[in-house]
Amino acid sequence: MNIKEAKEEIIRTIKAYTAVDEDDQPVIPISAQRPLLLMGPPGIGKTAVMEQASKACGVGLLSYTITHHTRQSAVGLPELVHRTYGEKEYTVTQYTMSEIIGSVYEYMERTGHKKGILFIDEINCVSETLAPTILQFLQFKTFGTHKVPDGWIIAAAGNPSEYNASVRELDMAALDRVRLIHVEADFGVWE
């Protein structure tokens, strides 16, 4: 599909994922809301249509280029805490909140947007050490042990390998967890 059709599909998805019933519960359960993945050549407007779609739907948008992150900034930093199991005390490792998840909460407080899109750009260019974290993120909507807030949709974008030498092909496990939208270059839709 072209970028204009992709934008319309994104808007439909945002409306479907943010719709609630009379009890203020999501019409589509959060566990069934698959992240959107826009895959297409660089420069065709994938990021721009995310901005346009979020504005059209009145939801927030927080964008991250994942290649700028390390495993620690995505998952959080380890810290030692004391826990008692049975009658014995242990020192165990837990993780601080991810910089990315923390930014969503800060954005919500700053803007008042309780619903939004967490947009991860260049998702298929992550380092090898971050790839398992991205798989967990796509499946469970978590970075480390912290979850993306309810009401927030996950969307991502990437480029096919012929456009970027650092692309890591997404495996079937990752592709099975997303709603893939192939976006083709179509100059005519910009005229």
What are these language model-derived features?
Residues 1-191:
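AAA+ P-loop NTPase catalytic core and its hallmark functional loops
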